[in-house]
């Protein structure tokens, strides 16, 4: 018997295969990556503004890039 309450999707976060509970948002992926701000986020090479992270639904196979700015000299 298949339990529909534990459905997951597989996405890529910074080139690492990751399973998230479905439905999943970009915010869920960021939480799974345990990344601290500041950073920029893109899904399938498209920048997603921070205000949209909680509403941006992910699909299986999405490629998420979380980019941290480089500082220093």
Where are these regions (language model features)?
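Ubiquitin-like/PB1-type beta-grasp interaction modules and other compact soluble beta-rich domains
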Residues: 1-72
């Amino acid at each position: 018997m298949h339990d529909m309450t534990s459905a997951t999707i597989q996405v890529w976060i910074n080139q690492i295969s990751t399973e998230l509970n479905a439905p999943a948002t970009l915010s869920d992926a960021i939480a799974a990556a345990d990344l601290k701000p500041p950073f920029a986020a893109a899904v399938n090479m498209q920048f997603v503004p921070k205000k949209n992270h909680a509403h941006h639904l992910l699909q299986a196979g999405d490629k998420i890039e979380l980019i941290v700015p480089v500082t220093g000299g």
